[in-house]
Curated annotation (Swiss-Prot):
This is Sex-determining region Y protein. Acetylation of Lys-136 contributes to its nuclear localization and enhances its interaction with KPNB1. Deacetylated by HDAC3. Transcriptional regulator that controls a genetic switch in male development. It is necessary and sufficient for initiating male sex determination by directing the development of supporting cell precursors (pre-Sertoli cells) as Sertoli rather than granulosa cells. Involved in different aspects of gene regulation including promoter activation or repression. Binds to the DNA consensus sequence 5'-[AT]AACAA[AT]-3'. SRY HMG box recognizes DNA by partial intercalation in the minor groove and promotes DNA bending. Also involved in pre-mRNA splicing. Its main location: nucleus. The gene is SRY.
Length: 204
């Protein structure tokens, strides 16, 4: 894919800024808005295809436990009897009912869950459960990016506090020099009368 910066360079290098080339700018901007530059930290990558490596692993579902085996039919039955009830409320009710069951009532569902887990291990011997990462950190890192990715590189988004303090110190120092340059010069040479008054006051 042609990068946004190279596309802009090719557009402005053409004679007369052809309209056909200019029409491609919004499309390139939209496509490039989903991709960070290579200088982004690997911890906060925002590329749209970042999760492609684990896509095959994520498609494999976890084997059902005893509660899931039991609640399949119960959830469907409760949803039909209470069509206006929310899923969260249904889950709470099913959890309460599951706790009220005796061990003898739960045992058949534990046996079925063990069979399903054994079949799952045979079918996917290299399967490892990996909980999904929260997308909050990715959203925060992507929100720091500018609207136009070519204007400011990703590495400049994360400010360096030390450099920021140095810049503020330099700016303050330059302002003070500018203000001192406009002040009238101080006459350090005093007249003989003033020196006599000062020496007389010190003797007293």
């Amino acid at each position: 894919m042609q990068s946004y910066a190279s596309a802009m360079l090719s557009v402005f290098n053409t004679d007369g800024y052809s309209p056909a080339a200019q029409q491609n700018i919004p499309a390139l901007r939209r496509s490039s808005s989903f991709i960070c530059t290579e200088s982004c930290s690997s911890k906060y990558q925002c590329e749209a295809g970042e999760n492609s490596k684990g896509s095959v692993q994520d498609k494999v579902k976890r084997p059902m436990n005893a509660f899931i085996v039991w609640s399949r039919d119960q959830k469907r039955k409760m949803a039909l009897e209470n069509p206006k009830m929310r899923n969260s409320e249904i889950s709470k009710q099913l959890g309460y009912q599951w706790k009220m069951l005796t061990e003898a009532d739960k045992w058949p569902f534990f046996q079925e869950a063990q069979k399903l887990q054994a079949m799952h291990r045979e079918k996917y011997p290299n399967y490892k459960y990996r909980p999904r990462r929260k997308a909050k950190m990715l959203q925060n890192s992507c929100s720091l990016l500018p609207a136009d990715p070519s204007s400011v590189p990703c590495r400049e988004v994360q400010l360096d506090n030390r450099l920021y303090r140095d810049d503020c110190t330099k700016a303050t120092h330059s302002r003070m020099q500018h203000q001192l340059g406009h002040l009238p010069p101080i006459n350090t040479a005093s007249s003989p009368q003033q020196r006599d008054r000062y020496s007389h006051s010190t003797k007293l």
